[in-house]
């Protein structure tokens, strides 16, 4: 059986996998679903939220696994798992992009998001001040 690492998208936490985890475990797989920094139960300050911090969080989880993992990223986490694959390629057996951003080499999230201005993600990328306000509210 395999070890799955499930990485949630923006404004979610490990909780969003609550229906997936038992299904994979029932098939005999091991499942790890971390909260990214600043999401779910993680109290990292918004000023410390970077792609590097997200990638290191996931890489740390993967380094604790006993075998190469199936790394699954949802939505924004497509960017994260791409970065993790650069950090620990030998620890990953497969990457799975689940309705996720799949950036071209050197492409940023803001460039991906703003490529389609009718997309709600593009709206959020263009309105960073709203995101910062939302993060403050989420922590209250």
Cite the ranges covered by each PLM segment.
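Short beta-strand immediately N-terminal to the catalytic nucleophile in serine-hydrolase-like folds
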Residues: 71-73, 98
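Flexible "cap/lid" loop of the alpha/beta hydrolase fold
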Residues: 86-132
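Conserved HGGG/HGGXW glycine-rich cap/lid loop of the alpha/beta-hydrolase fold
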Residues: 2-43, 66-70
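Gly/Ala-rich beta-loop-alpha elbow adjacent to hydrolase catalytic centers
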Residues: 73-77, 81
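Helix-loop "lid/cap" segments that line or gate small-molecule binding pockets
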Residues: 131-140
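Active-site loop/oxyanion-hole signature of alpha/beta-hydrolase fold enzymes
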Residues: 30-70, 86-87, 110-115
């Amino acid at each position: 059986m395999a070890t799955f690492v499930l990485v949630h998208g923006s404004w979610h936490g490990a909780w969003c996998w609550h229906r997936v985890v038992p299904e994979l475990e029932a098939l005999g797989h091991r499942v790890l679903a971390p909260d990214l920094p600043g999401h779910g139960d993680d109290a990292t300050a918004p000023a410390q939220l970077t792609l590097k911090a997200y990638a290191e969080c996931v890489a740390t989880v993967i380094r604790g696994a006993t075998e190469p993992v199936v790394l699954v990223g949802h939505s924004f986490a497509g960017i994260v798992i791409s970065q993790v694959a650069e950090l620990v390629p030998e620890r990953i057996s497969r990457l799975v992009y689940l309705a996720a951003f799949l950036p071209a080499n050197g492409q940023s999230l803001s460039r991906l998001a703003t490529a389609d201005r009718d997309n709600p993600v593009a709206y959020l990328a263009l309105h960073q001040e709203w995101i910062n306000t939302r993060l403050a509210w989420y922590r209250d």
